[in-house]
Amino acid sequence: MLLTAALALAAVSRLVDAAAVAIDTRAVVDGEPTTVDRTLLFQPPDNYTDPRTLYARTVELSDGKLLATWENYSPEPPPVWFPIYESLDYGQSWTEISRVQDQVYGFGLRYQPFLYELPQAFGDYPAGTVLLSGSAIPTNLSETNIELYASRDQGLTWEFVSHIAHGGVALPNNGETPVWEPFIYVYEDTLIVYYSDQRDPNYGQKLVHQETTDLVNWSDVIDDVTHSTYTDRPGMPVVTKLPNGQYFYVYEYGGTSITTDYSFPIYYRIADDPRQFADAADHYVNASGYIPVSSPYAVWSSVGGENGSIVVSSGRQPLFINRALGDPDAWELYDDFDQPAAYTRSLRVLAEDDDFLLVAGAGVLPPSTTNNVTVSVYKISEILGL
């Protein structure tokens, strides 16, 4: 009996050791950051439905590993999922490691995924937990549900955590009531999820956030951006911290604010507290008369001078850089790079060296039968000509 138990314990020990070795081997990040010229991350099969892929997002984990996901238009049934791909060489090559499935409704995880690594513990989830937020939406688009999932093993397995927001039909029409486009950020002991909200009858769409300290219990909805004209549609919020301690909040402003035709120029606000953008002044990105439109993303890098560089992407090809902490008169346009326009490109400066800017895209809005997922890595200093 004791011998049997001892042998069993030894066998378990060997399995645990083998698993640890496998995990450690998988987790090794190879080499150093380098530039990458538009590498193909994922080519969807021919049976994928239009638009095939959209809305690529990435996260860099604390050990240098990169994860990527996107809207994935696989044929249904079965329900759609968010794929998780991993890079161990700073974006040069990628491998699928898991799929985040809808574990609650069975609708499928359909729209607008976002990845984030916890810098500190929240509730039962330790620092290093990877979070994914996105929308569970049925095939008929009859409702929207912004959900929170978590991975305790760097993206290999996933568990449902909580519901953040529920809305109506997934159509971007004024009068409908969906919720869209989550973005996660941690401030002090609070985790914030920013998103677009059409549920308020006073606004075609507004920008809001909700807060949590345990990933399970969420605050009431807090307004971030509202505009007095009902048909205005601020959307797609992204937040990044500046070196002076302020926070840069970028969004698209659907409306006629600066044009006679309805368009989506890129606006931004700057605040001392990322929970208090509602009273901050509006500015728009304008680089010598070129005003970018739609699907923004923003990051900050220390490269570019004493204030570093705010880098903004839009739905068009160029990047827009501000080296004066968001001064409205200091935007510069740069378009000498190969990563194509997309809905929507995401940006990431690499922690090992924030001169390296990773740009990911998954194609354009339908009809778009040639979409795929690509990644490029550039040096901001080279973009700036430094």
What do the PLM-derived regions correspond to, one by one?
Residues 1-25:
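Fungal secretory targeting signals
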Residues 19-54, 59-110, 118-174, 186-230, ...:
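Beta-rich carbohydrate-recognition and catalytic domains
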Residues 204, 235-236:
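His-enriched metal-coordination microenvironments in redox/metal-binding proteins
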